[in-house]
Every structure is written in structure tokens, then in C-alpha cells.
């Protein structure tokens, strides 16, 4: 493979990953008003609208000027009923989750979201497709432009836990991504 083809291939892979992230963020945006879908491990997850009391003033500072109250109670007095999986309820609004758990109420377990031996949010190249483990499902995108694929997408049966067949909407997205990649390749 000459240098030009390698550069085109690299750009195509970068575009696929960027478009995939955009679709993921689009799915995340549908979860709720300014709610973080998955904070990084150790971070605190909270909804933006839950940190203000019901009797908030008519004039609110811009979100960049908000300061969380510092009066967190002693651990013996904390209300732990709002959190699952050993999380600590803070200000009766959000949870500080233990490692491997996340979500508003520590309801999601990272350990259950892997695809067999493939960790969550990991890309896995397979013959003529590029797969990603996302919340326990291995989702594959055809890569018909790869050398040796000759425009054909090979039907691969990948072994992973909890990996159902893609729904029709995901297939449409996959073909749309493949079309975008092919148009990018033909442009160069």
C-alpha cells in the first residue's frame, strides 16, 4: 500500500470514529435535559436542574458561575437511600458512586457492559468491518473500502456476550456511515 492510500485510509478511519461519536452523543442527548449519560470513573454524576432548590430566585447566574454549596453533612447523617450499589447520597440530589458504577443513582455497572473479553467503549477491527463494544453490544460497521474487501462486506459472526442482531435503525446508520466513507474515499 503506497503512502497516499495509507493517508486516505487513516482519514477515513478518523471520520468513521468521529461520526460514530457524534451518533453516540446524539443518543446521549436524548436521555434527558442536561444529564450526563456516563461520567468518567470517580466523577460525580448529577442533573443540572437538581442542584438548585425549588424556591430559586428569578434571576439565575450563568451556568459557568454556579458554585455548589460546601455544607456536606457528616457521613453518619447522610441519606443513603437515594443511591444504589453502595453509593453515597450527597445533598439529596446526586450520588458519589464507588468504582465501576456510574449514573445518577449508581445504577449502571461497568463490569456488566463488556462484550465478552472486549471492554466497553473499545474499537475492534475485524476483517472487512470495524466493531465497537457499547453497553454490552458489539456493533460492527462495514469497511468495504479496506484493501482486500473489494467492496464486499463479509458476514462475520463475532462471539461476544449479550450481542443481539442490529435493529433496522442501526443498520440504516451503518449503511449511511459506509456511504459517507466511500464518498470520502472517492473524493481523494
Curated annotation (Swiss-Prot):
SUPFAM superfamilies: EGF/Laminin. PROSITE patterns: EGF_1. GO terms for molecular function: activin receptor binding; growth factor activity; nodal binding. Expressed weakly in lung, colon and breast. Expressed also strongly in primary cancer tissues; lung and colon cancers. It comes from the Eukaryota. Glycans are attached at residue 79. Signal peptide: none annotated. InterPro entries: Cripto_growth_factor, Cryptic/Cripto_CFC-dom, EGF-like_dom. It is a peripheral membrane protein. Transmembrane segments: none annotated. It is found in: Cell membrane. GO terms for biological process: anterior/posterior pattern specification; blood vessel development; determination of left/right symmetry; heart development; nodal signaling pathway; signal transduction. GO terms for cellular component: cell surface; extracellular region; plasma membrane. Keywords: Cell membrane, Disulfide bond, EGF-like domain, Glycoprotein, Growth factor, Membrane. This is Protein CRIPTO3. It comes from Homo sapiens (Human).
Amino acid at each position: 500500500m503506497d503512502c497516499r492510500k495509507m493517508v486516505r485510509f487513516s482519514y477515513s478511519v478518523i471520520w468513521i470514529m468521529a461520526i460514530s461519536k457524534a451518533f453516540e452523543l446524539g443518543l446521549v442527548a436524548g436521555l434527558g435535559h442536561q444529564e450526563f449519560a456516563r461520567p468518567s470513573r470517580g466523577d460525580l454524576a448529577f442533573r443540572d436542574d437538581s442542584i438548585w432548590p425549588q424556591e430559586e430566585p428569578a434571576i439565575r447566574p450563568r451556568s459557568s458561575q454556579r458554585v455548589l454549596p460546601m455544607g456536606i453533612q457528616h457521613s453518619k447523617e447522610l441519606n443513603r437511600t437515594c443511591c444504589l450499589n453502595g453509593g453515597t447520597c450527597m445533598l439529596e440530589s446526586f450520588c458519589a458512586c464507588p468504582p465501576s458504577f456510574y449514573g445518577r443513582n449508581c445504577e449502571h455497572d461497568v463490569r456488566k457492559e463488556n462484550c465478552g473479553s472486549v471492554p466497553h467503549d473499545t474499537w475492534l477491527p475485524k476483517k472487512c468491518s470495524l466493531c465497537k463494544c457499547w453497553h454490552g453490544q458489539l456493533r460492527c460497521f462495514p469497511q468495504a473500502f479496506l484493501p482486500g474487501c473489494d467492496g464486499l462486506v463479509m458476514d462475520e459472526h463475532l462471539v461476544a456476550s449479550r450481542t443481539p442482531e442490529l435493529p433496522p435503525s442501526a443498520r440504516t446508520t451503518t449503511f449511511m456511515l459506509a456511504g459517507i466513507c466511500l464518498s470520502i474515499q472517492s473524493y481523494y
